């Protein structure tokens, strides 16, 4: 893939997603970052780090940075993307079971936003057990 002609989307701008998105931007890709939190998106748009990770503080792109787009709308971002990485949380419930609701919701939003006939690559980067992608996303295809 040629960075100059490839657009990467990152769904979830937390501890994993934000540094991942910044890494792709630094490598020359156009990047669309998406988070459902308006507060997170507003903070990133201001060029500030919403994660609390001090290693990321000086890395967040300044407002107006070329090739850097941040939104709360998966539907807005995904049609622009050649590759979409889903980096949403997978917390554990009170009974110590993985909560896959974020994975399912993000997958649904991505697949609904994909234009027909597209060859977009969609990657689940969240920490999950074997079979989760087939279990949560395959029925959506």
Sequence positions of predicted segments:
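Hydrophobic/small residue at the entry helix of a nucleotide-binding pocket
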Residues: 16
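Rossmann-like NAD(P)(H) cofactor-binding subdomain of soluble oxidoreductases
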Residues: 92-141
């Amino acid at each position: 893939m040629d960075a100059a002609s490839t657009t990467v989307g990152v769904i979830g701008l937390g501890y994993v997603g934000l540094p991942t998105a910044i890494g792709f931007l630094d490598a020359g890709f156009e990047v669309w970052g998406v988070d459902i939190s308006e507060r997170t998106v507003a903070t990133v748009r201001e060029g500030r780090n919403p994660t609390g990770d001090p290693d990321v503080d000086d890395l967040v792109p300044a407002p107006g940075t070329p090739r850097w787009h941040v939104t709360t709308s998966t539907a807005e971002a995904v049609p622009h993307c050649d590759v979409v990485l889903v980096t949403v949380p997978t917390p554990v419930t009170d009974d110590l079971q993985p909560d896959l609701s974020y994975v399912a919701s993000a997958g649904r939003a991505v697949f609904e936003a994909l234009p027909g006939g597209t060859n977009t690559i969609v990657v689940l980067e969240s920490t999950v057990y074997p079979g989760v992608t087939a279990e949560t996303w395959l029925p959506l295809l």
